Structures are given as structure tokens and as C-alpha cells.
Amino acid sequence: FQDKIDLVANDLEEYFWHEKSKVIVNSFGAYLFLHAQLQLKPYPGHVLILPPIIGVSNHNETMMRFYPPHADTLLQAATDGVFLCPINAQVHVGSKDWQSGSDGVVSFGAITGMPVSVVDRQGHMLSVDHVGRLLDEHLTR
């Protein structure tokens, strides 16, 4: 897992470390990006974070559970005040997203200062219309 984080951190620094950079991360890719951010200064570019995985999630109705590697690291870093969030980030998560856990993502955003938009009645796969609008906005900034 650490080798993937290191690869993301290296690629960000090597190829995308400027204010005009635009990065889009989704789900587990967001998880890797956020872990890479722990090793870096605040990312200077624009980041669109679509339903991020930030740690453990449970779905009580189906008894499903998702437990990624280093599941407590991001929340602990945020709580300890050592997570340096990207300078220009926006996070979007569906209100019915059990994989990301919208309540946890909102809490993480509040602790770190990253703005989080909860998309009503959507799950982990945000609608094409919603994501399309976000991409248009993100890529034309």
C-alpha cells in the first residue's frame, strides 16, 4: 500500500505541482491521494474529490463492511491537526453512499477545512449529469 501512496506523491510533485494543475480523484484513488497528501505540503492545484474513501465504512442493512489499509490514518491525522489539506479542493459524496459514508466525509471535511457537498439521494456512483457538470466547472477554471 505504501508504494502506491509514494507513487502518487511522486507523480504529484514531479508532474502536477503548480497552481494551475487540475487533479480529479475518485473513491479509492481519493484515498491514495489523501494519504499522499500526508507526506506533502498542501497541494497547490485544484482538486476535485469524488466520493472519497476516508476509512472504515459499514452498511447495516446489507451487513457489508469496507476496511481499507491504514483505515484510521486519515481521520487520526485530521483530528491531530497534522493533515494539510489541498489549497483548492472540493469534495462531493452521495447522501446514500455507504462505501464513503457521507456523515464521515462531512466530519472529515469539517475538521480539515475542505468543503464537502452532499448530493441528495445518490450513492457511491454519482449521476452522470452531476459529475458532468462538476467536470465542466473543474476543467474550465
Regions found by a protein language model. Name each.
Residues 122-133:
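Catalytic histidine-centered segment of alpha/beta-hydrolase-like enzymes
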Residues 95-97, 120-123:
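Acidic beta-to-alpha connecting loop that harbors the catalytic carboxylate
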Residues 62-82:
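Active-site nucleophile elbow and catalytic-triad environment of alpha/beta-hydrolase enzymes
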Residues 1-19, 123-124:
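Active-site catalytic motif of lipid deacylating hydrolases and related acyltransferases
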Residues 85-86, 91-93:
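Short beta-strand/loop motif that positions the catalytic acidic residue
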Residues 24-34:
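Gly/Ala-rich beta-loop-alpha elbow adjacent to hydrolase catalytic centers
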Residues 98-104, 127:
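Conserved alpha/beta-hydrolase "acid-adjacent" motif
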Residues 48-57:
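Active-site nucleophile loop of the alpha/beta-hydrolase fold
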